[in-house]
Amino acid sequence: ANLIALGGARQSAFERLGHDPAADGVNRSVRVYASEECHHTIQRSGGVLGIGRHAIKLIACDSKGRMRVDCLQNAIAEDKVAGVLPMAIVANAGTTNTGAIDPLLAMGEIATENSIWFHVDGAYGLPGILDEKISHLFHGLELADSVIVDPHKWLGSSVGVAATFVRDRQCLYRAFTQEPA
């Protein structure tokens, strides 16, 4: 599910520059910002999508395992100066190891201000939004360009079931559709 969402992020980032990465490949260095606590599929997706695993910049977390927004802002600024294209910001909505939920609202606002795709990895923790005691922790989810959830982890579906939700389905279509041979 993260792979699909980040494929949309890649398409969106390059289309803003007038380039179609699905058709013509990646033509410059990009960056995906994810916390030190991100799931390994984020790095794996970098390799599969042709941007490289090293395009994933791991951002420091606070003592509760949440991404430090100040470090995110610094990383984006440094990459812009270096000519690296910010492609996506990945927020955790409940990490697998600790259940930490990143500051979604602050991260989403940074993404919006910088025209960066905002992806929320809710594979493990997103069903927590249904609990009134913690639903406030998910404020900012509405800013996401993509969100994933794995219903088999909390919601009783079959193992391996995952869902990817995107704001712009046509972007996803362009990222993964190919013409007949």
Predicted regions mapped to residue ranges:
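FAD-binding core of FAD-dependent oxidoreductases
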Residues: 1, 119-128, 154-155
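PLP-dependent aspartate aminotransferase-fold enzymes
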Residues: 1-85
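Short acidic, glycine/serine/threonine-rich loops at helix termini
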Residues: 4-7, 44-47, 99-103, 128-134, ...
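A glycine- and small-aliphatic-rich helix-loop capping segment at beta-alpha/alpha-beta transitions
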Residues: 8-15, 48-50, 105-110, 132-141
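Active-site-proximal loop/turn and secondary-structure-junction residues that shape catalytic pockets
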Residues: 38, 94-95, 124-126, 153
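Active-site phosphate-binding strand-loop segment of PLP-dependent enzymes
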Residues: 67-119
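Active-site C-terminal subdomain of aminotransferase-like
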Residues: 87, 95, 114, 139-181
